[in-house]
């Protein structure tokens, strides 16, 4: 077993060897290096053909038509293009947007920007399970609501939102529905037709493809219009200008092809490892799973646990041979408790003591068992150092204590 152990697959994934090998054929002078927009010679034609193949591979995984896939630099850009693009195009119909407090920063900060431009945004509170209450969402809809944005799988707690039901409501009321599916494609079955989704963002690097490339599904029937946020040569049907990075697109296509082929065998294996990890922790004292564990409502690769009376940062330091995250990769650089966990109603202490384990293609049973052992030791050691743990063990109600300020 090689140390450190990587259990942060929700932050990024290594590129699959098969993907890297394929990408190498699209870079040098001996490979296909042309610009797909060069329509007058063989170099451009070959590049365009490679892009078409990848576009089809990506569309296949989500049940879309290849013409509905727009390439971007990643899911953050896709979220920006979807939300700003739809809001600006449809603003004559209304300026109200609905989203959820536990969305990714790429959605929340885009909505904040639109608020500065005069749009109004309703941020829904999730239930303690992490899931959206459909009735609350429906109640928030107004005559001037033009867009609803809800992620399919949460990046921190892995819960699967009821996208199909939300899609039905939006379709019936003719409201544009955007879904950030960065953490769901290739991990759960995704079919944009069945889900009634108008816009869907996804990435390559969460699915064993290269970083720096992503996509946005833009529904053709009923047709959804967007105002571009990057202008130039009119690439991607005018929605996203810029020379297409063929090697990255080919890599993403190959990664999606492999995911479609291997998902049925890969996900049950990953689920077994996740359950093994959970079973290793579940009998410990004061250990809480964040987000629902109900079957079908959580992605198989995610386990987010709070170890009470242990500070997340010191826990991370004690796990130097295990790569996990406290909060999400985008917020783990800050010392703020996770806003996702706070939105679930967790207090600061529990939010601070959370660790996200995310399992992937190359995780082994041996690594899981070693992780359980190391984490248990670290928790025991850190709790021994904690006066709060001693007080808790003595039966003192910590919430009733008046702490004095010095």
From Swiss-Prot:
Binding site for [2Fe-2S] cluster: 330
Residues that coordinate or bind pyridoxal 5'-phosphate: 75-76, 155, 183, 203-205, 243
Enzyme class: transferase
Keyword tRNA processing carried by entry: no
Record PTM N6-(pyridoxal phosphate)lysine, positions in chain: 206
Cofactor(s) the record lists: pyridoxal 5'-phosphate
Single GO biological process annotation from the record: [2Fe-2S] cluster assembly
Domain of life: Bacteria
Transmembrane segments: none
MF-aspect GO terms: 2 iron, 2 sulfur cluster binding; cysteine desulfurase activity; metal ion binding; pyridoxal phosphate binding
Active site positions: 330
Reactions it catalyzes: (sulfur carrier)-H + L-cysteine = (sulfur carrier)-SH + L-alanine
Pfam family, one: Aminotran_5
InterPro entries in the record: Aminotrans_V_dom, Aminotrans_V_PyrdxlP_BS, Cys_deSase_IscS, Cysteine_dSase, PyrdxlP-dep_Trfase, PyrdxlP-dep_Trfase_major, PyrdxlP-dep_Trfase_small
Subcellular location: Cytoplasm
Annotated Gene Ontology cellular component terms: L-cysteine desulfurase complex
Keywords tagged on the record: 2Fe-2S, Cytoplasm, Iron, Iron-sulfur, Metal-binding, Pyridoxal phosphate, Transferase
Pathway: Cofactor biosynthesis; iron-sulfur cluster biosynthesis
The protein's Enzyme Commission number: 2.8.1.7
Subunit field text: Homodimer. Forms a heterotetramer with IscU, interacts with other sulfur acceptors.
Similarity-based family: Belongs to the class-V pyridoxal-phosphate-dependent aminotransferase family. NifS/IscS subfamily.
Annotated function: Master enzyme that delivers sulfur to a number of partners involved in Fe-S cluster assembly, tRNA modification or cofactor biosynthesis. Catalyzes the removal of elemental sulfur atoms from cysteine to produce alanine. Functions as a sulfur delivery protein for Fe-S cluster synthesis onto IscU, an Fe-S scaffold assembly protein, as well as other S acceptor proteins.
HAMAP family the UniProt entry points to: Cys_desulf_IscS
PANTHER family (UniProt xref): CYSTEINE DESULFURASE (PTHR11601:SF34), CYSTEINE DESULFURYLASE FAMILY MEMBER (PTHR11601)
Protein name in UniProt: Cysteine desulfurase IscS
Gene: iscS
């Amino acid at each position: 077993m090689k140390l450190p152990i990587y259990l942060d697959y929700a932050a990024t994934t290594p590129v699959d060897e098969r993907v890297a090998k394929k990408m190498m054929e699209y870079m040098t002078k001996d490979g296909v290096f042309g610009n797909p927009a060069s329509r007058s010679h063989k170099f451009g034609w070959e590049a365009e053909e490679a892009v078409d193949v990848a576009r089809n591979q990506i569309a296949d995984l989500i049940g879309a038509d290849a013409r509905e896939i727009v390439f971007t630099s990643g899911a953050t850009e896709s979220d920006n293009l979807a939300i700003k693009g739809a809001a600006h195009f449809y603003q004559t119909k209304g300026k109200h947007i609905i989203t959820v407090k536990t969305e990714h920063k790429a959605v929340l900060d885009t909505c904040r920007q639109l608020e500065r431009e005069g749009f109004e945004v309703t941020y829904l509170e999730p239930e303690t399970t992490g899931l959206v209450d459909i009735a609350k969402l429906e109640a928030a809809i107004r005559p001037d609501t033009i867009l609803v944005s809800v992620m399919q799988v949460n990046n921190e707690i892995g819960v699967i939102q009821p996208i199909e039901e939300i899609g039905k409501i939006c379709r019936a009321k003719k409201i544009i529905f955007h879904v950030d599916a960065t953490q769901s494609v290739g991990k759960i079955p995704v079919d944009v037709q069945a889900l009634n989704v108008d816009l869907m963002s996804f990435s390559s690097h969460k699915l064993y493809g290269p970083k720096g490339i992503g996509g946005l599904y833009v529904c053709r029937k009923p047709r959804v219009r967007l105002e571009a946020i990057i202008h130039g040569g009119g690439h991607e049907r005018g929605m996203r200008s810029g020379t297409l990075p063929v090697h990255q697109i080919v890599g993403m296509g190959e990664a999606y092809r492999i995911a479609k082929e291997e998902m049925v065998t890969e996900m049950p294996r990953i689920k077994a490892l996740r359950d093994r990890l959970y079973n290793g922790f579940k009998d410990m004292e004061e250990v809480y799973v964040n987000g629902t564990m109900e079957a079908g409502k959580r992605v198989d690769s995610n386990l987010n646990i709070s170890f009470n009376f242990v500070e997340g940062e010191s826990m991370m330091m004690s796990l130097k041979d295990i790569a996990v995250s406290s909060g999400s990769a985008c917020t783990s650089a800050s010392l703020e408790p996770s806003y996702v966990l706070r939105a679930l109603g967790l207090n600061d202490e529990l939010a601070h003591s959370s660790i996200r384990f995310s399992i992937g293609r190359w995780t082994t049973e041996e690594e899981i068992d070693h992780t359980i052992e190391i984490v248990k030791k670290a928790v025991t050691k850190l709790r021994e150092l904690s006066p709060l743990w001693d007080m808790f063990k003595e039966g003192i109600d910590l919430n009733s204590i008046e702490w004095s300020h010095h």
